[in-house]
Amino acid sequence: MKRRNYFIFSCLMLMAPAAVQAQFDKGLNYKIETSATVSGGHNTPFWLVANKHGLSSIRKNNAYLDAGIFRDLEKDKKFSYAFGLEMVGASRFTSKFFIQQAYVDLRYRGMEISVGSKERGNEMKNDQLSSGSMTFSTNARPIPQVRVSIPEYIPFPWTKNWLHIKGHVAYGMFTDEKFQERFTAGRSKYTKETLFHSKAAFLKVENLQKSPVSVELGIEMAAQFGGDCYYPDGTVLRTPDSWKDFFRIFFPSNGDSGASESDQINILGNHVGSYSAAVGYHFPTWKIKAYWEHFFEDRSGMTLTYGMWRDCLTGLEVTLPENPFVKTIVGEFLYTKHQSGAFHYFATPAIDHSFTGADNYYNNSQYAGWEHWGQGIGNPLVTSPIYNKDGNLAFESNRVKGFHIGLNGKPTTEI
């Protein structure tokens, strides 16, 4: 009987979070949170790991204690500042102690500069219910960076409040080199001192006083560059990171003689990105939004030639009229099996024609992959390298077809 009860208990998941939050004057607040997960099987249940900003563990029977202090921006002032410090002690995580967030933000009117490691959300999607964006989701630990941005939509001049813009430019550094070295254990490549770059631009056409329709368009691009790549045979590939290379990453271009042969032929670094679009309609008591995102690894994925409609994340978000059951419903379809075609080929004297394909999403020949601390930075439905048993930091299952549904609500005021 005891064995049977233990089996039933271990097959069920027990998630026991407890949090204390308090707020002081001028936006200063703190939080203390603890969580424990007990489960059967080999790993923690997927949705207790994914989209937690890396504050989770795939190892079953894990726990953490999280404490943080934050100051929020004062949005009613032209100039404001914010900061945050969040530290975690954990059991059966990739680290026993780590800093989850440490940042300072300065904002003047609509412009902001942010320095440090900060959790950020998805673009055009519901952070609570979406499976996650293709380039940047909420799945991995924050990357420390210096980020200059227009973080929220602001009206573009002379458009009578119809046109709105936002965007950012950032440079930073990955912090998981010791984890990579431990995880690979000499079985596959890993990198040290890898640098990070991202940029994005978004445009929204909306004036709800005159029309219930809104349209959003955007592009996000990111790159890994610099650092050293260590191979199992002892080879070390050192990649350039001069000031000129920072510009080569911002304006994607070939590497110079100090770069690898591949980066001299192609583009310096590992580049990823996505196009996004959304159309919304606001009814008097509810609203609906359809969105689309296409991921790309290189030029073949960026052009219309290879069918941007084939590999994409499409979704529908419905915010319902006030009711005691369901507030918001999100449905999504993800497809990544095309990848610009079956193979990649450069023209030769024998065959004077090039074929671009086999994009191998989230992977790269020099860098570990589009991951941080083993968790994919993009959509978590593409299985993260931390699940690999062979010490490989590549995304081994990146051709995916999946459906996702999420909903939230407040059926009782007691919750």
Give, region by region, the residue ranges found by the protein language model.
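Internal, well-ordered domain-core segments that constitute the primary functional module
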Residues: 121-232
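Residues on the lipid-exposed face of transmembrane beta-strands in outer-membrane beta-barrel proteins
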Residues: 65-71, 102-108, 115, 146-152, ...
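Transmembrane beta-strand segments of Gram-negative outer membrane beta-barrel proteins
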Residues: 23-65, 74-85, 167-171
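Residues that define the transmembrane beta-barrel architecture of outer-membrane proteins
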Residues: 57-65, 96-100, 139-149, 193-199, ...
